[in-house]
Amino acid sequence: MSERESWHKEIDLFFVAMGYFTRIPMPKWVEVDADKLNKASRYFGLVGLLVGLLSAIIFWLTQNWLPAGVSVLLSMLTGILLTGGFHEDGLADTFDGFGGGWTAEDKLRIMKDSRLGSYGALALIMVLLLKWQLLVELALYDPVVAGSAMIVAHTVSRVVAASLIFTETYVRDDETSKSKPLAQHQGINDLFILIASGVLVLLVLKGIAALSLLLVMIGLRRLIVVIFRRQIGGYTGDTLGAAQQICEIVCYFVLLVVGGIL
């Protein structure tokens, strides 16, 4: 494979990842298949970077004319519209399953139900409110920091969530599952590119903030793994969405605390 063909392949994989995780239309020349979707996991962090950047731009464009709370709300709405609420849906399904089921089989069955239950609704409301409040506090502290936090959090949270694919067991055996292709064997190159995107985006932060966030994310990932293994024995597409949302919230919390210290 020539260097040009290799670059074209990587661009294809990025667009496949973008098409899977967002509502942004892929170029018509991009062909999607299970193998490409499997390899596209390496670019999930960059998709988060794109979503975070667009959300931050909306915030920065409006924060001089609108109250901080409204600008933050518009940035959150931008992220939700870009992804179609993909991760929020996974969060709600995960909490419905974990909260309403006794056995792993019960939990997986409930998570597959498209109806929203009380556990999922409460989790969704609390996460959105907490995200809004944390971002408003960051915006009042420094609008530049708030926008940068959006970019970092959207990227890093997706890197952590996607990294579960490489180490954990996919526990849903439904062949119609949209996440099934992602559950196939992942190569070390895929993991390296994924992690690199998360590490590189940390460069926009100050040293202590970047180090603090990195250490917290490592610890949080371990905690998420323990919980998922105890609850259902591994992961599903829904739990990856839940992991992303939880990690995003924690990113904002860490940056707010560290920002207050600095």
UniProtKB/Swiss-Prot annotation:
Lineage, uppermost ranks: Bacteria, Pseudomonadati, Pseudomonadota, Gammaproteobacteria, Alteromonadales
Gene Ontology molecular-function annotations: adenosylcobinamide-GDP ribazoletransferase activity; cobalamin 5'-phosphate synthase activity
Signal sequence, start to end: none
Gene: cobS
Pathway assigned to this chain's UniProt record: Cofactor biosynthesis; adenosylcobalamin biosynthesis; adenosylcobalamin from cob(II)yrinate a,c-diamide: step 7/7
Cellular compartments annotated: Cell inner membrane
Keywords: Cell inner membrane, Cell membrane, Cobalamin biosynthesis, Magnesium, Membrane, Transferase, Transmembrane, Transmembrane helix
TM regions (residue ranges): 43-63, 66-86, 120-140, 146-166, 191-211, 242-262
Membrane topology label: Multi-pass membrane protein
Similarity-based family: Belongs to the CobS family.
Cofactor: Mg(2+)
A Pfam family per the record: CobS
Recorded superkingdom: Bacteria
Organism: Shewanella oneidensis (strain ATCC 700550 / JCM 31522 / CIP 106686 / LMG 19005 / NCIMB 14063 / MR-1)
Principal location listed in the UniProt entry: membrane
Catalyses which reaction(s): alpha-ribazole + adenosylcob(III)inamide-GDP = adenosylcob(III)alamin + GMP + H(+); alpha-ribazole 5'-phosphate + adenosylcob(III)inamide-GDP = adenosylcob(III)alamin 5'-phosphate + GMP + H(+)
Protein name from the UniProt record: Adenosylcobinamide-GDP ribazoletransferase
Single biological process term from Gene Ontology: cobalamin biosynthetic process
PANTHER family documented for this protein: ADENOSYLCOBINAMIDE-GDP RIBAZOLETRANSFERASE
InterPro entries membership: CobS (IPR003805)
Enzyme class: transferase
Role, per record: Joins adenosylcobinamide-GDP and alpha-ribazole to generate adenosylcobalamin (Ado-cobalamin). Also synthesizes adenosylcobalamin 5'-phosphate from adenosylcobinamide-GDP and alpha-ribazole 5'-phosphate.
